[in-house]
Amino acid sequence: MAEKIQAIRGMNDILPAESHQWEYFEGVLRGLLADYGYQNIRTPIVESTPLFIRSIGEVTDIVEKEMYTFTDSLNGDSLTLRPEGTAGTLRAVVEHNLLYNTTQKLWYTGPMFRHERPQKGRYRQFHQIGIEALGFAGPDIDAEIILMTADLWKRLGISDFVQLEINTLGNKEERAAHREALIKYLEGHVDILDEDGKRRLYTNPLRVLDTKNPAMQDMANQAPRLIDYLGAESRAHYDGWKAMIEAVGIRYVENPRLVRGLDYYNQSVFEWVTTELGAQGTVCAGGRYDGLTEQIGGKPAPGIGFGMGMERVLLLLADKDLLPARKAADVYIVQQGEGAPVYAMQLAQDLRAAGLSVIQHLGEASFKSQMKKADQSGARWALVVGENEIRQQQVAVKPLRDGTEQQTVARTDIVSHLAGRMA
């Protein structure tokens, strides 16, 4: 026997026993996004490596340690499996000139790839739903996105288990002034910094504030705050955003250490977090990235978006027992005898045309075995077709869930009979 080949560590199969849960979540998401005017965009899972270096940032953890990068054997180009969805979406927007004299509200979903240590809620291949709102400069779109995510939690039934954290990263000049003060502060506490903090001190000092090291928490909490370096325009944007969030009744916590792990963010940033899943508590995160289109080779344009880890939301839904059971078929057709397979197949098609879901038994099996499979399928009824039913142009209807008696129904009446029983 050949050696069994298994899935790559951190890249998981989604099996039929759970795929219906994904379909449910995706269905809620699609309905929500349509309600807010978003259109679907689909981009390749492989992009040119410079796209991510230029957008995410060369000294970020993603680019330095987590990307799946390889060389194209045909032309020597460096290619990367996408670690996130924003860069590829904006590449497509710029390439196809989708912002010419208009704005765009786009959404995407699909697998992303990061080479990191697998753990609960964090995988090397993970699935993300993301949105990008492009061409909107004011804080109103920032607020609408918060409202939309809050609406999603309400539709899923998890509003009580997530909390919104917000911050502002200001503009480029304000971040530069804060960066200078932050480096000076960190240099005075270099003895407290761990190796990761020392590595980031001069390359990406803002990320030092995002440390999870308990020994660095007091130092990080006392560090200069970016909000204290905001100019009038950035402060007005932030205050306007907060006022709109408050006006629609959404509670939030200001977190001055919320900086996000990608270099393209500026102004508004946010995370929806939960304490129900242990250490990895972020279920949705995003922010504004004005100017990212210019970095990718397009004209400057304001933009904001978020990414949501689908596995983490599903873990939370499962933890709260909020995922639906698998929807069973309405009918399982049991057939036996000469002419029964064709008769059953025609019957199944008539029922499907009327909107019922039908499983027809295929192949040879005893009546007892077929009835056992019908019961295991979860179907509401077993329809029994044998030589006698074919001669009489009838169907035997056996309820499987409510204990009522079996009935014989004329073939011409079976659709209306079952429709009446389902009403």
Curated annotation (Swiss-Prot):
InterPro entries: aa-tRNA-synth_II, aa-tRNA-synth_II/BPL/LPL, Anticodon-bd, Anticodon-bd_dom_sf, His-tRNA-ligase, HisRS-like_core, HisRS/HisZ, HisRS_anticodon. It catalyses: tRNA(His) + L-histidine + ATP = L-histidyl-tRNA(His) + AMP + diphosphate + H(+). Signal peptide: none annotated. One of its GO terms (biological process) is histidyl-tRNA aminoacylation. Its EC number is 6.1.1.21. GO terms for cellular component: cytoplasm. It is found in: Cytoplasm. The keyword Nucleotide-binding applies. It is an enzyme of class 6 (ligase). Pfam families: HGTP_anticodon, tRNA-synt_His. Keywords: Aminoacyl-tRNA synthetase, ATP-binding, Cytoplasm, Ligase, Nucleotide-binding, Protein biosynthesis. GO terms for molecular function: ATP binding; histidine-tRNA ligase activity. Belongs to the class-II aminoacyl-tRNA synthetase family. PANTHER family: HISTIDINE--TRNA LIGASE, MITOCHONDRIAL-RELATED, HISTIDYL-TRNA SYNTHETASE. Homodimer. This is Histidine--tRNA ligase.
